[in-house]
């Protein structure tokens, strides 16, 4: 552990700039529209309207928590039980079948880090998740996560996913 502390300090020093949480890092979407304004087709990723926590349907919130981080409201960015469960499941399977990252860790990675699987990135993800947990309420973390997470079919955010999959806003 004595060697781990300087390494964590070095990784903390090398963190990305996190001063502007609200910064928009989204890529452009190209929309082809008819003369009457109807969208004919879209190219690239789709981003929906930003929804505040109270605007997001409770069943969406509960579903994401149930799937991604059952103890979200009980931890401070790291879920040791969830991490241990994932390690055991992966060892039994002999491959990666389950992740142990919390919603806060996933948000830290999605907002600030690359998807590379390195020890450095994992330490930075953990440090950033602690920072998010100190800076934001659980509801704010969920709102940012649900507005920025990838839901498939090129849809980023719960509103874009709802529009893409169901044809209406969340």
Where are these regions (language model features)?
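Juxtamembrane regions of bacterial inner-membrane/periplasmic proteins
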Residues: 1-170
């Amino acid at each position: 552990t004595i060697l781990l502390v300087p390494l964590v300090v070095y990784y903390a020093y090398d963190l990305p700039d996190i001063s502007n949480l609200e910064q928009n890092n989204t890529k452009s979407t190209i929309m082809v529209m008819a003369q009457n304004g109807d969208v004919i087709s879209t190219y690239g990723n789709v981003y929906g309207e930003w929804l505040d926590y109270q605007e997001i349907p409770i069943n969406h919130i509960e579903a994401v928590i149930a799937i991604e981080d059952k103890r979200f409201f009980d931890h401070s960015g790291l879920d040791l039980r969830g991490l241990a469960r994932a390690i055991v499941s992966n060892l039994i399977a002999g491959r990666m079948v389950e992740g142990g990252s919390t919603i806060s860790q996933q948000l830290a990675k999605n907002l600030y880090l690359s998807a590379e699987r390195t020890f450095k990135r994992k330490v930075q993800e953990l440090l950033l998740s602690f920072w998010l947990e100190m800076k934001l309420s659980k509801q704010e973390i969920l709102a940012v996560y649900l507005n920025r997470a990838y839901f498939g079919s090129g849809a980023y955010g719960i509103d874009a996913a709802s529009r893409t999959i169901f044809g209406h806003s969340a």
